[in-house]
């Protein structure tokens, strides 16, 4: 096997050693070669990709209002007519990596009031559970270089039910389920088109496009297909900015040239009879603001022309936006394909000639080979389908994101000045922030903006297929034009200063381990770069979130929107503050992750040994404060065998907040094992460890097994010792509490019969078990951490169980489920939880995929039942998908779980069966998740 990878840093030059026993023998293939070429900067295959957002309207970036109501300032009804300032959107579109030139298809069924050029959905205020896309579409395939991509859109023959979707969701309360497109019955008689969009690259800047429509209905139907090419409007905001131009290519039929000073010239070739329609990508001022237009051919002119309006487009066929209008009549079951090609390379022959279809076939074959090499284990075809679908969704979710806070606050010279109040409003403390990158988004319609902790989980999945991109994402987030000068990482555009869990050190080390294991590359330069910046972030956490110096942390909502009885980002109605079990757990995890990275780097630079000792001490102090401390700090409840947040009132009274939630389970994830070989190689660190055991026993006894040695003479650093771990697992693995058929619930089911209620000044604050959507409007009401199953924290709990097993071995067994009498090792429990999560997407004994819920059409119809959606979260009892429907972001972690389960089950063993030499030579623990 030939291993290729990143250049080693000058001071950390240990050679990458292919690993015995657990290294994947990755077959070299063309797609792997393209990924390596991109990483090594020899070919820029990532220059073009699916970087066009699904939604730009309703975002903070486009909001110039005084009140910060982004949804109402730029609503869906403006999107077809109003130029965007900070980005573009479209359906299954592509663009260059700075989004100068964009391509996307649009459609019209002859019945809709507008052409379908972007996905429709409800804004936050319109939805009974917040914003929600109301379309039927699927990401089918993609590869890291985007040399092959495929997606599917289901478009009804009848008029799209825009008004019905808005009205019915407005009628429903938060106690009702969302009203989805499938609920309108518009697909019941199969009167719709299946439209497949495929892209294949012949070269990095030579993209072939194939759009195929199939009539699934019993009657003939007319479909209009309008491929569109346009330049992002960069010229309407300040003088002297480049203005792209699209015009017919001289002397060549069925071809248009798109020329831009910074991008050069691209040609769009197209086949067949299509009516060319050209306009400027500029606002229709008459339609939006009821004032005169500066020129006659504006952004929505193509929409109006397709629907029959004359004079809406430029007869000279020149502009900054082009539409090619095809009309096709399809009999029942019939299909038709349109071929296009966007390139800056002169074709050797006919641009849409004999090589066109073979290039698609070749790229599809290479994609199959790429994924077959990635997971060569004998998993079921369904496991492979689910894994590949997760990778596809993750890659389709890469989006160009542009946001310069200083310019956004000040406004643009050629536009009316924004309200003065904005200078003290949203994100005004982030004037340094300058984002101009391709970023892996949580969901490109519902969450078309990065979220700091989501992104960390995305990189774990991306590291399997494109470690170079995964590493660049983490490095990007820690660069000085993202990270605040005080060390804080930007959370998300709605509130850059909100606090997200500090999972980035964990992600960095996992990426390092995954790449080392799968590709034989140990990229110490990456690890060191991220570590140095995270030192600043760790310091920010210590200085800001532990204001009392007790090593018990606050932090705010920490990504778990409505999990507590109070809004943890707001001023408490009781006064005082909350000492948070999850914030403190996260800091314990952060300390251990930074220690692990420092120990890895200390193998090559002794200076890191002292830093590792510093983080070791941080962990000891946090463990003491959380587990024991004095009368004012401990969060462990000995009676309940659980961790709770604590409410500290201003008069000195303190009350545990007895909510059984993931907050109380999070201390379990603070776990790290130390190899004996590592301690021998780092004598200074070992001496410091042993000094604490001898001289600070009150600190050492709060760590699981600092002095006692476990399997293989390993040491265990954890907040939970074996006894407390067992007590917490008894609760976590109880089907009447946390254990769902599909993973670990975010809130114990015990609160279904025993809700927690507090009355303050006549106002009731209450926590109930809510296994489906949220019944409150907290944080927009579109997320719910009071019962559903979420992938990211399930993933961390699974990893924690594996790490505990790495120390305790097979002798430590627990009941699974609690009360069943069946004993399992911690490794087997982790595997069972993994399989329960994976089962959300697999056909059950009745042939039904749990994520599709009780919708008969989705479960039984052959055109729907095998199409996969990776929802934001899942019903705590029946597994139905909820929230954002295309959040392959962190739900894409199912791909990593499938990889792990496939590998270890095929070998019939856990990592404990491997020889230590098969592990990275200086690893704190093996890469086991």
Segments predicted by a language model, with ranges:
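Acidic, mature catalytic/reactive cores of soluble proteins
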Residues: 3-8, 17, 22-81, 93, ...
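Structured, charged N-terminal subsegments at the starts of enzyme catalytic cores
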Residues: 90-94, 103-106
């Amino acid at each position: 096997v030939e291993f290729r990878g990143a250049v080693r840093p000058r001071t950390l030059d240990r050679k990458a050693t292919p690993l015995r026993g657990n290294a994947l023998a990755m077959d070299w293939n063309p797609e792997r070669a393209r990924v390596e070429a991109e990483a090594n900067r020899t070919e820029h295959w990532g220059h073009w990709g699916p970087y066009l957002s699904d939604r730009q309207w309703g975002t903070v970036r486009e909001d110039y209002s005084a009140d910060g109501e982004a949804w109402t300032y730029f609503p869906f009804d403006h999107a077809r007519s109003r130029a965007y300032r900070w980005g573009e959107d479209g359906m299954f579109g592509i663009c260059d990596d700075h989004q100068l030139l964009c391509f996307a298809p649009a459609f019209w069924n002859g019945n809709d009031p507008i052409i379908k050029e972007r996905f429709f959905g409800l804004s936050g205020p319109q939805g009974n559970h917040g914003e929600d896309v109301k379309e039927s579409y699927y990401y089918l395939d993609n590869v890291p270089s985007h040399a092959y991509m495929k997606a599917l859109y289901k478009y009804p023959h009848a008029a799209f039910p825009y008004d019905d979707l808005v009205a019915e969701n407005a009628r429903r309360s938060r106690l009702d389920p969302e009203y989805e497109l499938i609920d309108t019955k518009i697909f019941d008689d199969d009167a719709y088109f299946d439209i497949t969009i495929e892209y294949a690259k012949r070269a990095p800047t030579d993209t072939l496009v194939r759009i195929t429509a199939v009539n699934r209905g019993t009657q003939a139907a007319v479909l209009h297909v309008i491929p569109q090419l346009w330049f992002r409007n960069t010229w309407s905001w300040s003088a002297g900015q480049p203005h792209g131009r699209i015009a017919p290519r001289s002397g060549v039929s069925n071809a248009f040239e798109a020329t831009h000073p910074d991008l050069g010239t691209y040609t769009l070739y197209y086949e067949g009879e299509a009516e060319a329609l050209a306009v400027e990508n500029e606002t229709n001022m008459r339609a939006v603001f009821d004032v005169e237009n500066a020129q006659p051919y504006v952004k929505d002119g193509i929409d109006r022309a397709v629907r029959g309006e004359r004079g809406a487009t430029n007869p000279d066929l020149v502009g900054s936006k082009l539409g090619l209008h095809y009309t096709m009549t399809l009999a029942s079951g019939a299909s038709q394909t349109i071929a296009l090609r966007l390139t800056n390379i002169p074709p050797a022959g006919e641009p849409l000639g004999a090589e066109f279809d073979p290039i698609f076939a070749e790229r599809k074959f290479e994609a199959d080979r790429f994924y077959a090499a990635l997971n060569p284990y004998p998993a079921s075809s369904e496991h492979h389908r689910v894994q590949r679908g997760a990778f596809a969704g993750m890659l389709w979710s890469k989006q160009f994101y542009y946001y310069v806070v200083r310019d956004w606050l000040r406004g643009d010279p050629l536009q009316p000045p924004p309200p003065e109040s904005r200078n003290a409003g949203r994100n005004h403390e982030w004037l340094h922030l300058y984002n101009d990158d391709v970023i892996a988004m949580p969901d490109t319609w519902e969450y078309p903006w990065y979220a700091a902790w989501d992104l960390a989980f995305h990189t774990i999945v991306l590291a399997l297929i494109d470690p170079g991109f995964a590493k660049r994402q983490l490095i990007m987030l820690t660069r000085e034009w993202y990270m605040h000068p005080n060390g804080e990482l930007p959370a998300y555009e709605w509130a850059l200063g909100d606090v997200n869990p500090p999972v980035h050190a964990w992600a960095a080390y996992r990426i390092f381990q995954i790449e080392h294991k799968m590709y034989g590359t140990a990229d110490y330069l990456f690890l060191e770069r991220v570590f140095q910046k995270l030192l600043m972030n760790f310091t920010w956490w210590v200085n800001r979130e532990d204001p009392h110096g007790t090593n018990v942390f606050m932090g705010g909502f920490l990504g778990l929107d409505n999990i507590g009885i109070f809004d943890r980002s707001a001023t408490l109605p009781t006064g005082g503050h909350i000492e948070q079990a999850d914030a403190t757990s996260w800091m314990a995890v952060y300390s251990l992750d930074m220690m692990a990275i420092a120990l890895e780097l200390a193998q090559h630079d002794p200076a890191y040994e002292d830093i590792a000792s510093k983080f070791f001490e941080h962990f000891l102090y946090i463990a003491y404060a959380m587990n024991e401390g004095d009368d004012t700090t401990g969060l462990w409840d000995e009676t309940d065998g659980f961790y709770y947040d604590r409410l500290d009132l201003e008069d000195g009274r303190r009350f545990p907040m007895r909510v059984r939630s993931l907050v109380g389970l999070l201390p379990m994830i603070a776990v790290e094992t130390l190899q004996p070989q590592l301690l021998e190689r780092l004598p200074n660190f070992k001496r410091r460890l042993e000094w604490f055991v001898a001289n600070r026993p009150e600190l050492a006894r709060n760590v699981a097994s600092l002095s006692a040695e476990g399997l293989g003479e390993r040491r265990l650093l954890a907040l939970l010792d074996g006894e407390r771990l067992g007590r917490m697992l008894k609760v976590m693995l109880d089907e009447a509490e946390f254990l769902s058929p599909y993973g670990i619930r975010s809130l114990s089911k015990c609160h279904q019969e025993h809700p927690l209620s507090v009355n303050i000044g006549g106002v009731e604050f209450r926590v109930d078990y809510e296994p489906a959507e949220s019944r409150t409007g907290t944080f927009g009401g579109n997320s719910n951490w009071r019962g559903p199953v979420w992938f990211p924290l399930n993933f961390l709990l699974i990893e924690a169980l594996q790490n505990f097993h790495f120390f305790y071995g097979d002798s430590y067994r627990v009941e699974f489920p609690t009360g069943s009498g069946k004993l399992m090792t911690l490794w087997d429990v982790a595997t069972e939880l993994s399989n329960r999560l994976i089962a959300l997407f697999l056909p059950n004994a009745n042939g039904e995929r749990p994520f599709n819920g009780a919708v008969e059409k989705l479960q039984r119809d052959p055109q729907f039942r095998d199409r996969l959606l990776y929802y934001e979260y899942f019903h705590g009892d029946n597994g139905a998908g909820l929230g954002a429907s295309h959040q392959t972001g962190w739900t894409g972690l199912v791909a990593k779980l499938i990889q792990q389960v496939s590998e270890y089950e095929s070998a019939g063993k856990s990592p404990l069966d491997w020889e230590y030499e098969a592990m990275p030579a200086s690893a704190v623990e093996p890469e086991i998740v």
